[in-house]
Each structure stands twice: as structure tokens, then as C-alpha cells.
Amino acid sequence: MQIIRNETLSKINEKFLELNKSNKLALMPFIMAGDPNIEKTSEILLKLQEKGADLIELGIPYSDPLADGPIIQFSASKALKSGTTSIKVIQLLESLKDKLHIPVILFTYFNPILKFGLENFCELASKAGVAGLIIPDLPLEEASKFSKIISTYFIDLILLVAPTTPFERMKTVSYTHLTLPTSNDV
């Protein structure tokens, strides 16, 4: 049986189909961009790819990271002190576009995206090769509108669900977006 690549299949879905076909689990590490500095982030991304990461979740530091635990908050604080900004992270990914061949998912909050403007942020992220976005504070009610914009740039919107998320809400989320559980218990 031959699988024909669907040209509209996202980089993330394509990666998961490839892993599924090989009966493999995904290795998807998270790192905070800019910790300890933006130059080291470049080295870390390439080393993670070299060592077998299938996808990478790259955090953009934010001054009010409510959805993050203490370790990621500490890392974000260090990254901000090193001068890391959203635009520097996107420029870093743009500079690695020819070297980094695995899907990169940005983890960022909604406020920095609004600062850029939805369309502008999506355009810049797309040009930098971003495959997906996780926006933990994006209200589900805003997700549909944002999803329409983001999909025109071939970027997946990934919504998070918690073990406490009501089942009906999980169904709503899962019918329209990629979802990731926020706990090992799910």
C-alpha cells in the first residue's frame, strides 16, 4: 500500500502519520527560547534535532506566564533578562529554516500576538517555518476566529485540555483543532 502525500496535510499531522506508520512514539521536547540566550537556543534546537527529536515545542518568554509552572516561569524570566523577544525568536527560526527540518511549535501567550497583529504574527511565523502554535490563554470562543486566520498560513492551532475540562468542551475542541493533554494522566 502506498501513501500519497496530501499537499494540504500539515507538517505536524504529516509527522504523526509518519510516526504512526512506523509504530513509534513522538519525542517532543520543550525549551524556552533565550534561556540562557538566543544564540545558545539556536545550538540547542539543532542538537535536539540531531539527537532524534521529532518535533520541538519552543516557548516564547512572556512576563506574565500564568499557565506555566515555576520551572518554566524561571526560564522565561532568565530569557527576558537576556533580551529575548518574540521577534528575536521568529528571526532565529528564520535563520535556521534551511537547517531545522522538524516541525517547531511555538508556545506563546495571546497578548504578544495581539501586539504584532494576528495577520502580521502569522505571516512572520509562517515565513520562519513555524508549524504550530500553542496559546494557553486563547479563549475557546476566540479560537475559531483565530483558527481561520492561522490556517491560511498553514500553521496548526493546538489547544490544550486538562483532566478537569468538561467532556462536551473537549469534544468541541477536538472537532476543530489539534489538542494536547496537559497532564500525563490523560
Where are the predicted features?
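Catalytic beta/alpha-barrel core
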Residues: 131-142, 156-165
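Active-site beta->alpha loop and helix N-cap motifs at the rims of alpha/beta catalytic domains
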Residues: 76-134
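Active-site mouth loops of central-metabolism enzymes
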Residues: 30-39, 105-117, 159-165
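Conserved small/polar residues in nucleotide/adenosyl-binding loops
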Residues: 176-182
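N-terminal amphipathic alpha-helix/helix-capping segment at the start of soluble metabolic enzymes
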Residues: 2-28
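Glycine-rich, proline-tolerant flexible connector loops at the mouths of alpha/beta enzymes
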Residues: 57-84
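Conserved, mostly hydrophobic/aromatic
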Residues: 29, 59, 125, 173
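Active-site-adjacent beta->alpha loops and helix N-cap segments on the catalytic face
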Residues: 65-69, 84-91, 115-116, 137-150, ...
